[in-house]
Regions:
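Alpha/beta-hydrolase active-site loop
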Residues: 13-32
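Active-site signature of alpha/beta-hydrolase-fold catalytic machinery across serine-
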Residues: 53-57, 150
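Conserved alpha/beta-hydrolase
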Residues: 1-10
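Gly/Ala-rich beta-loop-alpha elbow adjacent to hydrolase catalytic centers
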Residues: 43-51
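Short, hydrophobic alpha-helical segments
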Residues: 31, 186-188
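Glycine-rich phosphate-binding loop signature in dinucleotide/nucleotide-binding domains
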Residues: 30-37, 127-128
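Alpha-helix termination/capping residues and helix-transition junctions
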Residues: 33, 58-59
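The alpha/beta-hydrolase serine catalytic core
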Residues: 61-150, 154-161, 166-185
Length: 188
């Protein structure tokens, strides 16, 4: 599935509430359509943030969770990396800012405020330690590995650092390492 404003989704404005609604719908669909014995989640970057927020609010419906380069400090990433001073000024004046990589979408001040209010770094995920694996590239240019190290340590989560991998794991050897570790973790 695609998160709101990602992939084939047609929503023009990004909200965290929509992410929660979409993930709930996907889980309900999977349960009704396939009646799986177990459900695993594999998310990258924002997908990692969104599932962590979901787990904090609803508990974990997953037997295993694998996160690659999770954006655990998303508010900081938006304000320090994605948004320009011009974007931040627009948001302060109540206007939308347009963000995104391949696909552009709108955010408003409420979205940025909701990121600050939902600071994943402040939540306790230690209850999920046995069912969660984080993998992160040591050369990630988008989500600082230091933030993820602090998050993993605080919550006693397993973190595998993939030497030389960037945020997108563009190197096929690094991606292969990630895929193999993911499969091993989910099926162990």
């Amino acid at each position: 599935f695609d998160w709101p404003c990602h992939g084939e989704d047609v929503k023009p404005r990004f909200t965290l509430a929509d992410c929660d609604t979409y993930l709930t719908a996907v889980l309900e669909y999977a349960r009704e359509r396939f009646a799986p014995e177990s459900i695993s989640f594999n998310g990258t970057s924002f997908g990692g943030y969104a599932v962590l927020k979901y787990m904090h609010e609803h508990g974990s419906p997953f037997d295993s969770v694998v996160l690659r380069c999770p954006a655990v400090n998303l508010h900081e990433i938006f304000t320090g990396l994605y948004l320009t001073e011009n974007d931040l000024d627009k948001l302060r004046r109540g206007k939308d800012a347009v963000v995104g990589f391949e696909k552009k979408f709108k955010i408003n001040r409420q979205f940025l405020d909701s990121l600050a209010e939902n600071d994943i770094m402040q939540y306790d995920f230690s209850a999920f330690a046995d069912s969660m694996l984080i993998m992160h590239g040591t050369r990630d240019e988008t989500v600082p590995i230091d933030a993820v190290r602090r998050f993993a340590e605080k919550n006693d989560l397993m973190l595998i650092e993939i030497n030389g991998a960037d945020h997108m794991f563009k190197d096929p050897a690094r991606m292969s390492e990630y895929v193999n570790d993911t499969v091993d973790f989910i099926f162990s």
